Amino acid sequence: LIRVLANLLILQLSYAQKSSELVIGGDECNINEHRFLAALYDVWSGDFLCGGTLIHPEWVLTAAHCDRYRLSIKLGMHNKNVQFDDEQSRYPKKKYFFRCR
């Protein structure tokens, strides 16, 4: 019985890895459809960290785990692999943390 379950688990995992679509049945959004979306990058490595929301011309709201010593915030991105003319990059001057209790 354990061998059968192990084989079923391996079969299921190997099938799941073959899927090439990230979102099943999804469509690519239009350019500037989500213009309040911000992408946060680590300045030193250039790695994508997480997303945020532009809630004011000078404020981006993110989750607490997005904190790094030096961040780059990119706005106006449609595809992170393609650079567009209206993309903007900013560096935060201050960071604020609010604890929910």
Curated annotation (Swiss-Prot):
Tissue specificity note:
Expressed by the venom gland.
**GO cellular component annotations, sorted alphabetically?**
extracellular region
Q: Which residues form the propeptide?
A: 17-22
Posttranslational modification: Glycosylated.
Q: Which InterPro entries match?
A: Peptidase_S1_PA, Peptidase_S1_PA_chymotrypsin, Serine_Proteases_S1, Trypsin_dom, TRYPSIN_HIS
Q: Which UniProt keywords apply?
A: Blood coagulation cascade activating toxin, Disulfide bond, Glycoprotein, Hemostasis impairing toxin, Hydrolase, Protease, Secreted, Serine protease, Signal, Toxin
Q: Where in the cell is it found?
A: Secreted
User: What is the residue range of the signal peptide feature?
Assistant: 1-16
Q: Cystine bridges: which residues?
A: 50-66
Gene3D superfamilies in the cross-refs: Trypsin-like serine proteases
Residue positions of the active site: 65
- Select a single GO molecular function from the record's annotations and give it: toxin activity
Q: How is its activity regulated?
A: Strongly inactivated by diisopropylfluorophosphate (DFP) and phenylmethanesulfonyl fluoride (PMSF), and to a lesser extent by tosyl-L-lysine chloromethyl ketone (TLCK).
Q: What is its EC number?
A: 3.4.21.-
Per UniProt, residues of the Peptidase S1 domain are 23-101
Question: What biological-process GO terms show up in the record?
Answer: proteolysis
Q: Which domain of life is it from?
A: Eukaryota
Partners and quaternary state? Answer: Monomer.
What family name appears in the similarity comment? Answer: Belongs to the peptidase S1 family. Snake venom subfamily.
Q: What does this protein do?
A: Thrombin-like snake venom serine protease that releases specifically fibrinopeptide B from fibrinogen (FGB) to form fibrin clots. Shows a preferential cleavage at Arg-|-Gly bonds in fibrinogen beta chains. Cleaves fibrinogen beta chains preferentially to alpha chains.
PANTHER family referenced in this protein's UniProt entry, alphabetically: RIKEN CDNA 2210010C04 GENE, TRYPSIN-RELATED
What is this protein called in UniProt?
A: Thrombin-like enzyme okinaxobin-1
Q: Which organism is it from?
A: Ovophis okinavensis (Ryukyu Island pit viper)
